[in-house]
């Protein structure tokens, strides 16, 4: 006698946005790429972890390249063609993600490094001795 559970499938509406900003955040452990419009609204995002890489493989340049290819495919469905790229973080996936975005067919108009530099903020972690 109870109601049947109806699940609604949320369809992604196709926005027609020609240009946007790609935020590449590359840490020591992972690389996330978010493509937004000029106002900062997220259009598509991906990361090395969501692409199925686990553990230390997430921090590789290849994982960043696969994530960049995935996010570019999603953004091109919305009609995006030109990108400004903002790169942040010290990780190894910075350059490979940028190269993958260019290879996907985007016109990259500018590349900015927006890595936050502390003015003597938090104490850094101890040095690695190998």
Curated annotation (Swiss-Prot):
> Keyword annotations for this protein?
Ribonucleoprotein, Ribosomal protein, RNA-binding, rRNA-binding
Q: What is an example of a GO molecular function annotated in this UniProt entry?
A: rRNA binding
One cellular component term from this protein's GO annotations in UniProt: ribonucleoprotein complex
BP-aspect Gene Ontology terms: translation
The family database entries (Pfam families) matched by this protein are listed as: Ribosomal_S11
Presence of the UniProt keyword Thylakoid in the record: no
Which cysteines link up through disulfide bonds? none
- InterPro entries assigned: Ribosomal_uS11, Ribosomal_uS11_bac-type, Ribosomal_uS11_sf
**SUBUNIT field:** Part of the 30S ribosomal subunit. Interacts with proteins S7 and S18. Binds to IF-3.
Q: Which family does it belong to?
A: Belongs to the universal ribosomal protein uS11 family.
> Which NCBIfam families does the annotation name?
PRK05309.1 (NF003698), uS11_bact (TIGR03632)
* Described function: Located on the platform of the 30S subunit, it bridges several disparate RNA helices of the 16S rRNA. Forms part of the Shine-Dalgarno cleft in the 70S ribosome.
Protein name as it appears in the record: Small ribosomal subunit protein uS11
Which organism's genome codes for this protein?
Nitrobacter winogradskyi (strain ATCC 25391 / DSM 10237 / CIP 104748 / NCIMB 11846 / Nb-255)
User: Gene that codes for this?
Assistant: rpsK
